[in-house]
Amino acid sequence: MRHYEIVFIVHPDQSEQVSAMTERYSNIVTGRSGKIHRLEDWGRRQLTYPIQKLHKAHYVLMNIECDQESLNELEHSFKFNDAILRHLVIRMNGPITTPSPMMQEGKSRPPHSSDEDSENTAPAKAKTADSPGEDTRTTEESDPKP
């Protein structure tokens, strides 16, 4: 059996259905003596570019070990599920069980409750960029006139 990494993006209106979808896809893999090495729900995230006029979507990552028939059935399910906007299947050399960088990033930062919080922290970050030790004066300010 081969190892695969699968990422699929779910329509944001179907976020409540993600757990049922992952359960269904997990059953496809394990039903044919496959294994799931890692299953991560990254949650609703901003898309890099709009897909079907949507700017946010729900991301899910799976690292699995399965045969070709199971993989074909998974891909068939992805293609004919209207809730899945995009999917990507990559063949891996071996199983990956460590948390992905997306999950590590989420643990190191406190979660933001809304978009307003990120707007409020942006000016604070800009203010802290100018440290007291830096010389940020213009030439008019730095050259005293007699």
From Swiss-Prot:
**Keyword field contains Ribosomal protein:** yes
Which species does the entry assign this protein to? Nitrosomonas europaea (strain ATCC 19718 / CIP 103999 / KCTC 2705 / NBRC 14298)
In the record, the note on similarity to other proteins reads: Belongs to the bacterial ribosomal protein bS6 family.
GO molecular function, a single term: structural constituent of ribosome
What biological processes does GO assign it?
A: translation
Q: What does this protein do?
A: Binds together with bS18 to 16S ribosomal RNA.
InterPro entries referenced in this protein's UniProt entry, alphabetically: Ribosomal_bS6, Ribosomal_bS6_sf, Ribosomal_S6_plastid/chlpt, Transl_elong_EF1B/ribsomal_bS6
Stretches with biased composition (Basic and acidic residues): 106-115, 134-146
Note one Pfam family from the annotation.
Ribosomal_S6
Query: Which keywords, in A-to-Z order, does the entry hold?
Result: Ribonucleoprotein, Ribosomal protein, RNA-binding, rRNA-binding
For the region Disordered, give the residue spans: 94-146
Write out the GO cellular component annotations. cytosolic small ribosomal subunit
HAMAP family per UniProt: Ribosomal_bS6
Record's protein name: Small ribosomal subunit protein bS6
